[in-house]
């Protein structure tokens, strides 16, 4: 078992197929297949279920991936520890909530790119729950999520203050007597969806149904025509120019006041690329 074999195994798991892993690793598919089989033979176990549309980890594969993540990260940390601290470059994978990507990150990353033009930046959007898991599993270097995050392995840096509001169609002037509205939200794991559900429960409001959509603009579009209500930072409405299309309604301070934090693993040596991002916050 060597580190390259573990890197191949890790990449196949992340990409969900041997062919996609080969593309990412810039090598031929037969080499990836051979290295996975070699690793399985060496360990005497099957690591992947082979399916028509990709692969899936077996129970033994689920065990090994944790050690593979740690081994690859340990090697990366060793490289960083002896490399030139003045050189700010290389890859930087950042996760973010969709709302943060829309209103907060464009200017931030424009400034970042001006200062660190050779950093290879990649952005992955998802829910807070999904992004926390990806940071913990070494699939992201850091992520912008709704904070604070209470986890022993997570470090965090406050990035933005936000005020959460309920957003309705324009003609609704009060949310005190909403009659079984439809909730227009992201999928489960979205922290703002959780706040909306908490507010509704405490206010005695029972939703008629919950519709999960995949985009911020889609949710606001449905709200605009009266299909339902949603909850997001107030800055969404002004920054995306929805002020004249929807109504915003404040929440009690304990629910409405929140912050977005940049999270990362405490045990990872911070690269110059990540340090540079934190310094801009």
Segments and roles (model prediction):
Residues 40-57:
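A short LG(V/I)-centered, amphipathic sequence patch enriched
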Residues 151-189, 194:
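Flexible hinge/capping segments at coil-to-helix
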Residues 42-43, 64-86:
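Alpha-helical linker/hinge and terminal dimerization helices associated
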Residues 89-152:
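Central regulatory/effector-binding core of bacterial HTH transcription factors
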Residues 104, 247-281:
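A late-sequence structural motif
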Residues 127-132, 136-140, 145-146, 191-192, ...:
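Hydrophobic hinge/microswitch elements
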Residues 10-28:
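Short helix-boundary/capping micro-motifs
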Residues 182-203, 270-274, 278:
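Secondary-structure junction motif
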